[in-house]
Design a protein with these regions (language model features):
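Aromatic- and glycine-enriched glycan-recognition loops and surfaces
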Residues: 1-27, 40-44
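Short, solvent-exposed loop/turn and secondary-structure capping segments
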Residues: 25-27, 33-38, 69-71, 153, ...
Length: 234
């Protein structure tokens, strides 16, 4: 703000008063091309900030990009629980419907002895069915067979509509199993939970990342306009 002591909203207004629109720049990376802080991993925060400033155009670069991993975790089971712990259900790998290259492998180091492989690089998916007592937010726990000390990516699709993206950090240790949690929303009664990694190339990764920023910008501008009773800026 040293260059714009009145703040960014005032700058936008000054530019608008000249009959012009103001845009801003960031990068789909950890840093911009000038090695300044960028938006990858901070999409929601940056979108909210740009909406509050009143920014009307946006240029999104590709410097210092970190691609989404093509590798998916191996799944031993999933469990679903509500927030107060009064409900929990565990669904083993054997109860999933498998598609594409997804398959069950045996492993004596796991309590269940089995896990799902083949979910990486858009090659396969696993579909679980789960019944819950009421609408609401639930904790989805992924029981993971730990292999490969690397980041892994998974998309969780609930009832064929709502998508939750999650990155599983590198896992190592003496035990063969691990856990990773995702908050999801379910409806009372029957639900489906599909697991897959749709990233099969760097192009796929970029498309998913750019789409995420686009969604956050549209959400942020709509929410800001609704809160302040103003026209929604593009």
């Amino acid at each position: 703000f040293s260059n714009f002591p009145s703040g960014m909203p005032a700058l936008v207004k000054s530019v608008n008063d000249l009959g012009l629109k103001l845009g801003i720049y960031s990068s789909n990376g950890t840093l911009t091309c000038e090695d300044l802080p960028a938006s990858l991993g901070n999409e929601a925060t940056d979108a909210d900030t740009f909406a509050e400033w009143g920014v009307e155009y946006f240029k999104y670069d590709f410097c210092h990009n970190v691609p989404i991993p093509m590798r998916a975790p191996y799944i031993e089971y999933i469990s679903v629980a509500n927030s107060d712990g009064s409900f929990e259900t565990v669904i083993p790998a054997d109860d999933a419907s498998l598609f594409g290259d997804a398959k069950i492998l045996e492993d004596e180091r796991l309590d269940s002895g089995r896990y799902i492989s083949g979910l990486s690089a858009h090659r396969g998916s696993a579909l679980f069915g789960v019944d819950v007592p009421e609408d609401g937010e639930y904790s989805l726990t992924l029981g993971i067979r730990k292999k490969s000390n690397s980041f892994k990516y998974l998309e969780v699709t609930v009832n064929g509509e709502d998508k939750y993206a999650t990155t599983v950090p590198p896992t190592k240790g003496f035990t063969a199993d691990g856990r990773h949690q995702v908050k999801i929303k379910l409806r009372a009664g029957a639900n489906t939970i599909e697991l897959e990694n749709p990233i099969a190339s760097r192009q796929d990764s970029a498309a998913v990342q750019y789409a995420k920023m686009g969604r956050e910008l549209m959400r942020a501008t709509a929410e800001y306009a609704d809160r302040n009773g103003t026209e929604e800026r593009p």
